[in-house]
Amino acid sequence: MVIVIEPHGTYAIYEQIVNQIKNQIISGTLQPDEALPSIRGLAAEIGVSVITTKRAYEELEKEGLIRSVSNRGFYVCKYNGII
């Protein structure tokens, strides 16, 4: 999964993460049931805070695009074409 952050962009960093993951789900780059990086792992990979990544994952979960599985991590949900 590739996420590119523009630190001084128009959107907040967590929104950039949400939008990029959302686009990868819609385009099929990320498939249903595919595991996402851990919150800490993604934060370290893209150089943002854990809190920022957590907020992005929470937003994606609210939108029904990802789900959290206890003690296992986050997984992509089946995209039904509606957001």
Short names for language-model regions:
Residues 1-35, 41:
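Extreme N-terminal segment that seeds HTH/winged-HTH DNA-binding domains in transcriptional regulators
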